[in-house]
């Protein structure tokens, strides 16, 4: 039994038709694009060389970046872990504290100077009042401190009349009676052998101030 035959593809038929109607001459093709293709091949080879050189440069840069980054990282770790000048130390903290204290003192001094300036400006703007002379009332009050009532002068004491009448004052002064025996026990003689005994009594002096000496205003009285 024979297999059925299949017809040829149309592409093959078209190619055959094209070759039949438009024949290709190899000599003409080589002359037309041969030089351009040679130049293109030279450019592609140069591009390939340049890309290879660029790849080498990129590889070298990556190696340098890795090495340099490792060096920087090691220096940073050394600054924080070992005695490195860039790392903070105890003296750095003390110096920082001193700087902060100096800044605080400068700020306080500036504020004090500003307050003093404002106070001086306020004093200059306030009108000054001249001291006025004391009035008569003030002078009288000041002179009353040494008044004649507290310390009366001697001339005033001598001119001051006595308020006690002369008659009543004379009647009150009684001289002692020599005929009247003084009261008390043991004043009379009781027998010749016992003698004279003195009686009890009191001697009082009453004085009244009337601007006279003490001898004139003193009354002696036996009780």
Curated annotation (Swiss-Prot):
Keyword Nucleus: yes
Chain intervals with Gly residues compositional bias: 192-210
Keyword Cytoplasm: yes
Coiled coil location: 94-125
Entry keyword set: Cell cycle, Cell division, Centromere, Chromosome, Chromosome partition, Coiled coil, Cytoplasm, Cytoskeleton, Kinetochore, Microtubule, Mitosis, Nucleus
Bias kind Polar residues: ranges: 1-14
Region (Disordered): 1-21, 114-223
InterPro entries with a match to the protein in the record: DASH_Dam1
GO cellular component assignments: cytoplasm; DASH complex; mitotic spindle polar microtubule; mitotic spindle pole body
Biased composition annotated in UniProt, kind: Low complexity: 151-162, 180-191
UniProt subcellular location: Nucleus; Cytoplasm, Cytoskeleton, Spindle; Chromosome, Centromere, Kinetochore
Any Gene Ontology biological process: attachment of spindle microtubules to kinetochore
First-listed, main subcellular location of the protein, grouped into a coarse class: nucleus
Subunit structure and binding partners: Component of the DASH complex consisting of ASK1, DAD1, DAD2, DAD3, DAD4, DAM1, DUO1, HSK3, SPC19 and SPC34, with a stoichiometry of one copy of each subunit per complex. Multiple DASH complexes oligomerize to form a ring that encircles spindle microtubules and organizes the rod-like NDC80 complexes of the outer kinetochore. DASH complex oligomerization strengthens microtubule attachments. Within the complex, DAM1 and DUO1 may form the microtubule connections. On cytoplasmic microtubules, DASH complexes appear to form patches instead of rings.
Main function: Component of the DASH complex that connects microtubules with kinetochores and couples microtubule depolymerisation to chromosome movement; it is involved in retrieving kinetochores to the spindle poles before their re-orientation on the spindle in early mitosis and allows microtubule depolymerization to pull chromosomes apart and resist detachment during anaphase.
Family named by the database record: Belongs to the DASH complex DAM1 family.
Protein's name in the database: DASH complex subunit DAM1
Gene: DAM1
